[in-house]
Amino acid sequence: MAFLTACGTANSDLEMPKYTVLSNAVYDGQYNIEIRDYAPRLAAEVTVKGEREAALSEGFRILADYIFGNNTAKTDIAMTAPVTQSSNAKIAMTAPVTQVESAQGWVVQFTMPAQYTTETLPKPNNQQIQILITKPLRMAALRFSGFSSETRFQNRAKILADYLTQQKIATLGPPEFAYYNDPFTFPWRKRNEVLIPIVSSP
């Protein structure tokens, strides 16, 4: 998936969203599932119609264009990990790039580096891009390596949903897909995740 080339390999060099692991469990003897609390974070997102992989490619291109200088400050914004950058200042890229299906299409999101606020983050020139602060979320997460094919993601999404049903944990929305690596990373070293928002315990 060449659209992730700019992301680089997810490692300690890339900033990632902060979360707290509340619990973990092994499901069906092999799937490690975590329950996480995510803090609010500043993000840029775009909604794209089409099949999942094509929509991710187009959404990544639009958001990468923004962080690499197509913004009101003409500033590079450093990338973060996962996918859910005036002068030559940098907006670092984060990881992962995240993707979730909505009624309007696929929402592709980049988390913005923690150094920015809504006031200091350069504004996108492309009006398709929305800047927002995410709500605090509790998420169930299933991590896996290998290729991020449609079949693998849908399979892992079903496994995670089955676990939540078994545990009688109510969900709040559709699965979110998180991509941490570039396409040149060896498959067994890739980090992919399926995340499902869930109800917080009272």
Show which residues each predicted segment covers.
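A solvent-exposed interaction/effector surface
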Residues: A2-P202
